[in-house]
Regions:
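Active-site entrance/lid segments in N-terminal catalytic domains of soluble metabolic enzymes
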Residues: 2-172
């Protein structure tokens, strides 16, 4: 049989088939099956800061005390992060191939916090999925490209695992 071993972002892969972030990669059981079926690496379903905040906002009630809203927001954040970190740990236990976490954040502090926790949970690498809309008011030529570079630099200063940047079609 032909040897398909390769490397990607410093990771040794048995073949170049990398399962992308999707609903197919949102459970350790599914990831185990993908590994058994021959995948070379798996990118976990992305963790979106925006979805966490949206869920928290949906539970806010103007009749609540502000402290209650803050508590709910923090609880939901911690719960969602815990679920994601558990997915990493459980996938690592059952998969003999690299597990790549994926995050999408919109606040600078969360890029760093999420990256640290993901590395500590045992992910082999981190995909950063940056969405930048050029319809934003503060857009100037090159500003989104610079934002990508800045986020990457901050994350690379913080963690040791490989970082992969997912680029959208809105960059020049």
């Amino acid at each position: 049989m032909t040897d398909l071993k390769t490397t990607f972002a410093g990771l040794s892969l048995r073949n170049p088939i990398i399962i992308s972030s999707s609903g197919l990669t949102n459970s350790a059981g599914k990831n185990k099956k993908l590994a058994e079926d021959g995948a070379g690496a798996i990118v976990l379903k992305s963790l979106f800061e925006e979805q966490i905040m949206l869920e928290a906002d949906q539970l806010k009630d103007p009749a609540f005390y502000p402290e209650a809203s803050d508590y709910l927001e923090e609880y939901i954040r911690e719960h969602k992060l815990s679920e994601y970190l558990t997915l990493i740990k459980e996938s690592k236990k059952v998969c003999p191939i690299p597990i790549i976490a994926s995050i999408n954040c919109y606040t600078d502090s969360e890029w760093i916090d999420f990256a640290k926790m993901i590395e500590e949970a045992g992910a082999d690498a981190l995909e950063i999925n940056i969405l930048a809309l050029q319809s934003e008011v503060q857009y100037t030529y090159g500003s989104f490209e610079q934002r990508h570079i800045d986020i990457l630099r901050h994350i690379k200063k913080t963690i040791k695992i490989p970082v992969i940047m997912k680029l959208g079609d809105n960059l020049t």
